Amino acid sequence: MLGFLSARQAGLEDPLRLRRAESTRRVLGLELNKDRDVERIHCSGVNTLDIEPVEGRYMLSGGSDGVIVLYDLENSSRQPYYTCKAVCSVGRSHPDVHKYSVETVQWYPHDTGMFTSSSFDKTLKVWDTNTLQIADVFNFEETVYSHHMSPVATKHCLVAVGTRGPKVQLCDLKSGSCSHILQGHRQEILAVSWSPRYEYILATASADSRAKLWDVRRASGCLITLDQHNGKKSQAAESANTAHNGKVNGLCFTSDGLHLLTVGTDNRMRLWNSSNGENTLVNYGKVYNDSRKGLKFTVSSGCSSEFVFVPYGSTIAVYTIYSGEQITMLKGHYKSVDCCVFQSNFQELYSGSRDCNILAWVPSLCESVPDDDDETSTRSQLNPAFEDAWSSSDEEG
């Protein structure tokens, strides 16, 4: 750290490199925080978490009991040991509570005054955060597995919705109706995700073993159907274009939007080039996945080499995205983990499990990593994740 600070002060290093190196060090030191609890409100499993991107202070959780809870993650007590309190909740006694399991919650990307939730009760609800009242409700004919709003959209207010049916539905928050439908999958849609780079690009994952990329402005079908074999095993058959050998039940773009990660019930995770759909063939080994519905995993942001955090049974596996190396397994839950979310401001991770608990994982402050200029090679040998994979083109593109 001191070496980086001196180099930055002397103008020998880009300040961004210091920030990325420190972010990387903190992610590599993640451990269960023994001084911080998240108030336990859910009486059954926690299915979904989301931290608002404006301040990074408030977190939503949705449970199998249909309950939605809003937490304040800030330590206002200034004490070393504290509990992240629930600010408010949509409990079982609330008149507008979801009847069945809440599968996805998401903050409105530009303002904490609104959030959305979807459930097995076949509804997508839009909430006013301040009053905890419903602003709008979208009703569907099928169970809702997943929904997502674009984090970068300025020209549309579309919410992509994946249901038990094979069609992806796009709901317009401005008009309050489903604007159009994307057809191409053959079975239920288990996960949907908008690109953080291009506002009209959408990724979808289905139980038909396929993952697709769409430009929602086009009426002629999907842009790309991801093929794990990169077209080498079969030149013609559409049936050959499968992303996994089982259900594809999880999607996540990298923070720059240049790549897409998918997970499937074949116990594999794959990394794809999001511009041409090419399988990069990064080998992550076995990534255990027995989820019958969507698996919500997340990626880091602002590190020298980015990381992916994947629920792995009752643990969370941490991999470097571009090398496939497994860094660690975060152990603390008693039952299967269904979701996790990364807080990029402080490099913290929050996870939700079927044991009804939400755990906080924070950087360990005990161990320091050598950062002297003379010890750069030693640092690289300690962990290849410290090697700076950033280039200016990533930021400019």
From Swiss-Prot:
Keywords noted in UniProt: Chromosome, DNA damage, DNA repair, Nucleus, Phosphoprotein, Repeat, Ubl conjugation pathway, WD repeat
Positions of disulphide bridges: none
WD repeat extents: 41-81, 97-137, 184-224, 243-282, 332-371
Intracellular or extracellular location(s): Nucleus; Chromosome; Nucleus matrix
GO molecular function, one term: ubiquitin-like ligase-substrate adaptor activity
Matching SUPFAM superfamilies: WD40 repeat-like
Origin: domain of life: Eukaryota
Main localization, broad class: nucleus
Ranges for region Disordered: 370-397
Any one GO CC term of the record: site of DNA damage
Pathway note: Protein modification; protein ubiquitination
Pfam family, one: WD40
Modified residues (Phosphoserine): S391, S392, S393
Any GO BP annotation: positive regulation of DNA repair
Subunit field text: Part of the CSA complex (also named DCX(ERCC8) complex), a DCX E3 ubiquitin-protein ligase complex containing ERCC8, RBX1, DDB1 and CUL4A; the CSA complex interacts with RNA polymerase II; upon UV irradiation it interacts with the COP9 signalosome and preferentially with the hyperphosphorylated form of RNA polymerase II. Interacts with ERCC6/CSB (via CIM motif); promoting recruitment to lesion-stalled RNA polymerase II (Pol II). Interacts with KIAA1530/UVSSA. Interacts with a subunit of RNA polymerase II TFIIH.
Functional summary from the UniProt entry: Substrate-recognition component of the CSA complex, a DCX (DDB1-CUL4-X-box) E3 ubiquitin-protein ligase complex, involved in transcription-coupled nucleotide excision repair (TC-NER), a process during which RNA polymerase II-blocking lesions are rapidly removed from the transcribed strand of active genes. Following recruitment to lesion-stalled RNA polymerase II (Pol II), the CSA complex mediates ubiquitination of Pol II subunit POLR2A/RPB1 at 'Lys-1268', a critical TC-NER checkpoint, governing RNA Pol II stability and initiating DNA damage excision by TFIIH recruitment.
Identification of the protein by name: DNA excision repair protein ERCC-8
Naturally occurring in which organism (per UniProt): Bos taurus
